[in-house]
């Protein structure tokens, strides 16, 4: 107990005691002493109140100073300057206060935690307008990375693609920066394929659509963003699905901006085992083809329903890529295709998708296709699937509406149709801007 509290209690005791004695003895001197002590008690109460208010104001001042220091350390001044220079009126991006984040997460309550990793924690946040967001608490490696962090925040804030999780804003008044993203309700693709909470009901049509959406999003990052972005950690855990199973590429914590005048970057290896480009792993040279490799692994997961890396599987099949490629070469792909999706009608489409996956995971990056080419091939595959389904349903309309010169005897579209679908894929990428 503090000294001022002790003095206060003692004073009250003496006032009460003297009052009792004065009443008994009818001593006017004691009454005066009581009055003096009572006033002293009031003065002590006043001093105590003033001290309390002073401490509150000091704490508020210290907190304000601390927030300002964090804001500057995390690059707040630089961000405001860059936003002004970029024309912030065209960027839908908000800088939140620490108080905003505390209220949104109910004081960072553990019940609000959506997920955790070695470098981050994601909270569910509710903003004053009742909109739900995902708040990611991350950390900077050192102060030398501040400018790079701000650059990436600026670039990501300008991405407005329907298949990329939208960065809504950030908070820099905390010890570590907080990033605020749109909230996606349906869990990750990993959850749907492998998680115990989901009984996977993803049909082949769903999986192909997800692959097309993810491929289009990555192609946009590589070719459509103001500065090419290499995601560097494409995996099923970083692909979120909304209530309509629309795919959203998420988690840009490992992403790198690639200057227009550079073919590749020399950087410390970062990524996830099972999805990590072996060429990047051995050379430390990063370019867009590393994302192509990772996407190929995701496509293999969609086809097989198996994890990218699983030590519970036999030695020959621990790594999905090597297992998948070998099965393809030995013409036994049917052994690893997910039983939930394979049927007589979609065998050709699944095998075509498997071929694309194998091409994406070639050891040499130069032998892999670009993501814009992958997106175009998958779009073409969907067009073929749609056309086959339509022809099966309305065979009598084939000659009248399509013309015999458009569809071959095997049901494949002509080269003209392929080019048209490439244009569709390019249009989708452009439309994401």
From Swiss-Prot:
Transmembrane helix is among the record's keywords: yes
GO MF: ATP binding; protein serine kinase activity; protein serine/threonine kinase activity
Residues recorded with modification Phosphotyrosine: 181, 280
Stretches in topological domain Cytoplasmic: 51-433
Modified residues (Phosphothreonine): 97, 267, 272
Principal location: membrane
Reaction catalysis annotation: L-seryl-[protein] + ATP = O-phospho-L-seryl-[protein] + ADP + H(+); L-threonyl-[protein] + ATP = O-phospho-L-threonyl-[protein] + ADP + H(+)
GO cellular component, one term: membrane
E.C. code: 2.7.11.-
Membrane topology type: Single-pass type I membrane protein
Annotated keywords: ATP-binding, Kinase, Membrane, Nucleotide-binding, Phosphoprotein, Serine/threonine-protein kinase, Signal, Transferase, Transmembrane, Transmembrane helix
Residues at the active site: 233 (proton acceptor)
Start and end residues of each Protein kinase domain: 108-391
Superkingdom: Eukaryota
Class of the enzyme per the UniProt entry, highest EC level: transferase
Subcellular location as annotated: Membrane
Residue ranges, Extracellular side: 23-29
GO BP field: cell surface receptor signaling pathway
Leader sequence segment: 1-22
Record-listed ATP binding positions: 114-122, 136
PROSITE patterns in UniProt: PROTEIN_KINASE_DOM, PROTEIN_KINASE_ST
Transmembrane parts of this sequence: 30-50
Membership in a protein family: Belongs to the protein kinase superfamily. Ser/Thr protein kinase family.
Known function: Putative serine/threonine-protein kinase that may function as a signaling receptor of extracellular matrix component.
PANTHER family linked: WALL-ASSOCIATED RECEPTOR KINASE 1-RELATED, WALL-ASSOCIATED RECEPTOR KINASE-LIKE 21
Protein's UniProt name: Putative wall-associated receptor kinase-like 16
Organism of origin: Arabidopsis thaliana
Lineage: Eukaryota, Viridiplantae, Streptophyta, Embryophyta, Tracheophyta
